[in-house]
């Protein structure tokens, strides 16, 4: 896969001079994602963070970000990871952000949600739980843990405490036939919404993977027709769920997942990706490295903490350094191969970047 390597971006930015920085500075950041930890207590076949993650983001690091969030007019902070609830200071971090006027959104595996449901409902404005099976066997095969009932209990507990989570499903060969059942299960558990995306097998470096990543997660040729039949069925049987937004994606967007899996098999082009996520959001890793999105690493100069970083380094400086400005320019120009096969793109109307959606609606409004 041809890519523009991040270590070349500083030189690229120098070549275009101050014009790039002047015209393409990021002056506002409505959405910031914090990886509270690189550790994870799941053992997913789709992800390698659990194999090597060690670092946590501490309360002091988040406190240092507050002036930058104010300067950049940040409205919403997504706490992710790894598994964010493994960070021993997750509650203090969420409370700090909320106390400073930020909406706080949790993305979790749900393994500890039952234990923390009451506190989570008090601290978060929205919760999204990843759930990749509708029965214990499928869940265990994908997640590597016998924890299906525990996660379902956590979803019910959060709903009972007044904050029904949304459920995010990563469709893959092991679970695509359960597509309609996921909708029924989400309703049974008291979820606010259910959302679907395709497993990312085109980007070998997503989710902490290494260069030797080999996948049998995608649909095979013989699976495409059954999947299309399921899509036809769900459009007919769940019209009201599409209309109400209980199913987050439109029928047309769900069909992009079929197109993606067909493209993996060289049976057509990848669905066109419409995304401007780096223009309104950024991801900050547990060690302070800033990325333009979940799937593309940030350049070396986009660092707000760690060895060799000056104490006055802040988020705005990291976002507008030569390397990050050039990287955003490459993404904007369509020069990053990862973008062409992205399964989780986001688009927000540039005229509405400053609008402040609720945490519960942001993902739906921003989805491409």
Stretch-by-stretch model annotation:
Residues 3-119, 126, 219, 223, ...:
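Conserved alpha-helical substructure of the radical SAM core
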Residues 2-23, 27-28, 270-274, 287-368:
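Flexible mid-to-C-terminal extensions adjoining Fe-S/redox cofactors in radical SAM and related proteins
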Residues 36, 83-86, 110, 131, ...:
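Structured beta->alpha junctions
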Residues 48, 117, 143, 294, ...:
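Short, flexible helix/strand-to-coil boundary loops that buttress conserved ligand/catalytic motifs
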Residues 1, 57, 123-126, 130-132, ...:
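Radical SAM enzyme [4Fe-4S]-AdoMet core and its adjacent flexible, acidic
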Residues 39, 43, 47-50, 278, ...:
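Cys/His-rich metal-chelating microdomains
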Residues 39, 130, 318:
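Conserved catalytic core of Hanks-type protein kinase domains
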């Amino acid at each position: 896969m041809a890519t523009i390597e991040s270590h070349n971006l500083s030189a690229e930015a120098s070549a275009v001079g101050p014009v790039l920085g002047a015209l393409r500075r990021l002056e506002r950041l409505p959405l910031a994602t914090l990886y509270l930890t690189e550790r994870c207590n799941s053992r997913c076949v789709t992800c390698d963070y659990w194999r090597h993650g060690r670092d946590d983001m501490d309360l002091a690091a988040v406190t240092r970000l507050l002036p930058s969030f104010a300067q950049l007019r940040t409205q919403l902070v997504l706490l992710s990871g790894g598994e964010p609830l493994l960070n021993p200071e997750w509650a203090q971090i969420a409370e700090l952000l909320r106390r400073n006027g930020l909406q706080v959104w949790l993305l979790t595996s749900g393994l500890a949600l039952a234990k923390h449901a009451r506190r989570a409902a008090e601290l978060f404005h929205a919760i999204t739980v990843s759930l990749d099976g509708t029965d214990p066997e499928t869940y265990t095969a994908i997640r590597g843990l016998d924890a299906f009932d525990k996660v379902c209990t956590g979803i019910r507990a959060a709903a009972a405490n007044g904050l029904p989570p949304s459920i995010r499903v990563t469709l893959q060969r092991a679970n695509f036939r359960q597509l309609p059942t996921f909708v029924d299960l989400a309703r049974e558990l008291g979820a606010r919404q259910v959302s679907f995306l395709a497993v990312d097998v085109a980007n070998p470096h997503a989710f902490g993977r290494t260069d030797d990543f080999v996948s049998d997660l995608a649909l095979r040729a013989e699976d495409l027709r059954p999947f299309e039949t399921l899509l036809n069925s769900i459009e007919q049987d769940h019209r009201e769920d599409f209309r109400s937004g209980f199913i987050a994606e439109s029928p047309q967007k769900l069909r992009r997942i079929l197109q993606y899996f067909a493209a993996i098999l060289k049976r057509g082009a990848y669905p066109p990706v419409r995304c401007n996520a780096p223009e309104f959001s950024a991801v900050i890793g547990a060690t302070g490295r800033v990325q333009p999105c979940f799937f593309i690493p940030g350049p070396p100069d986009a660092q707000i903490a760690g060895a060799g970083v000056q104490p006055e380094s802040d988020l705005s400086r990291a976002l507008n350094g030569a390397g990050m400005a050039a990287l955003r320019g490459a993404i904007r120009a369509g020069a990053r191969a990862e973008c062409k096969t992205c399964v989780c793109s986001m688009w927000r109307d540039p005229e509405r970047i400053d609008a402040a959606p609720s945490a519960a609606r942001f993902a739906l409004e921003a989805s491409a």
